[in-house]
Amino acid sequence: MRIAAIINARAGTVLRMSPSAVTERLSVVWGSLGHDAAIILAEGKDMGRMVRKACRDPDIRAIIIGGGDGSLSRALEHVLASGKSLGVLPLGTMNYMARQIGMPLDLAQAAVALAGAVQTPMDVGRVNDRYFLIRACFGAFPEFIQSRDRVRRKGGSFLEGALAGLSGVARRYRIVEAELSSPGGRARIATSFLMISNNLCRDSDPFLLERERMDGGSLGVYVGRSAGPVGLMELGLQAAMGRWASNEALFQGEMHWLEVQTEQRKPLISIDGEVEKMEGPFRFDILPGALSILVPK
């Protein structure tokens, strides 16, 4: 099978191993298993250009994205339009999607797993015209990610990044004031945390976020019960312990669509770990079985 592997040259694993070591390891593994693989290193806007080019190639059957969850999310628009399968090569920090589908985190083991993976339909979340695989968040979490990633880009450790993230939240504490509209009616909220996930979350290991399933055809909606810093601290501690379904600091709901009208015209939003300012209002919905993803046997 001919595949295209587009690798984020700025991904953590690539920087640790060196780009040449990563491409050589993948070439050896896939070549030994009889796969014809085009391995492309790219960064920034070139990632999107290379994904788009590979998706237009009729000879390529699968698009492998090497990077973090943000790299996967950014590739969705082109992969969905092409009808090709998406493969996950976990080279990022948290690699939530890889963990969700049982992909090994070791580079060589992941390459072997991808070679024998099974095409599996999976739901995709959407906010306005942007797709996501894991979650979108408003409030304190985007601030946490921004501050954390500044430190990580400078070579800081996971712990140093986490501490910087907490410090950033303390300095720029944000309250989300919004009107929510859903099939169940309308509600006004004032909270420090609003998360919309691709399917409902379950309790998991510490620092992870796992969904109950990836083909349930619904969004999970999580709203912090308190707008104050004490409530946010309680929520964050429970989330850090992997408590999502049993997190008492959250209101939780399940729905097929949700509209969010924030008081702020262009609030910060994190989508699969990438932070940006996006203009509202925000329309969230779920696309059942829209993506063919390669899942290890």
From Swiss-Prot:
The keyword Lipid biosynthesis applies. One of its GO terms (molecular function) is ATP binding. Keywords: ATP-binding, Cytoplasm, Kinase, Lipid biosynthesis, Lipid metabolism, Nucleotide-binding, Phospholipid biosynthesis, Phospholipid metabolism, Transferase. One of its GO terms (biological process) is phospholipid biosynthetic process. The active site is at E274 (proton acceptor). ATP binds at G68, D69, G70, S71, L72, S73, R74. Pfam families: DAGK_cat (PF00781). Residues 43-131 form the DAGKc domain. Disruption phenotype: Normal magnetic response, normal magnetosomes. Deletion of approximately 80 kb of DNA, including this operon, leads to cells that are non-magnetic, lack internal membrane systems, grow poorly, have reduced mobility and take-up and accumulate iron poorly. GO terms for cellular component: cytoplasm. InterPro entries: ATP-NAD_kinase_N, Diacylglycerol_kinase_cat_dom, NAD/diacylglycerol_kinase_sf. It is an enzyme of class 2 (transferase). It is found in: Cytoplasm. Its main location: cytoplasm. Induction: The last gene in the probable 17 gene mamAB operon. PROSITE patterns: DAGK. Coiled coil: none annotated. Its EC number is 2.7.-.-. Might phosphorylate lipids. Belongs to the diacylglycerol/lipid kinase family. This is Putative lipid kinase MamU. It comes from Magnetospirillum gryphiswaldense (strain DSM 6361 / JCM 21280 / NBRC 15271 / MSR-1). The lineage of its organism: Bacteria, Pseudomonadati, Pseudomonadota, Alphaproteobacteria, Rhodospirillales. The gene is mamU.
